[in-house]
Amino acid sequence: MGVRDEIRKILPEVDLIENKDLREKVLSTWEEGLKRGGWRPLDIARMPFTLLKPVKISFADHVRSVTKVCLAVAETFDEIYKGALKLNRDILLAGALLHDVGKLLEVTETGGTFKKTKEGSLVRHPFSGLALADAQGLPAEVLHIIATHSKEGDPYKRTAEAIILHYADFMNFDPLEG
């Protein structure tokens, strides 16, 4: 099984992206992040999604949950608001799947312990994730979601998709005990 197939198995929501070119760029970004970070795809299923508090939720599970929350919000808005709020579902999905991809460069494992890399101490994951995605040719709308999803994006106006992702991400972080 190739790296992309492994990524698809761990993050099956990638296949919900209808635009093939966008889907391939999302996979390329994950592939490059894994390579540069020295990870294998299966590592994201055991890597913690945060080092800020001791939770037993994997990076992969966090990304999947955030993505599913975003999709549920988009579907609910479409059903209830009947198109009054135009969302780009593929852009939202790509942003959700990639919002934390920079953590592949922010975290390392030494002797079974996960810790920040030197790079991760200097450049937080919204910035490294933006760089990874930009290098793979992701559109500006996805780059915007990655860049503004965390506190770094607070001073800026977010698109509707970026707002949904921002709150979905914090819904999957703030309530967790640590």
Where are these regions (language model features)?
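Acidic/His-rich, divalent-metal-binding segments that scaffold phosphate/diphosphate chemistry
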Residues: 1-112
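Divalent metal-dependent catalytic cores for phosphoryl transfer on phosphate-bearing substrates
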Residues: 49-52, 61, 73, 84-178
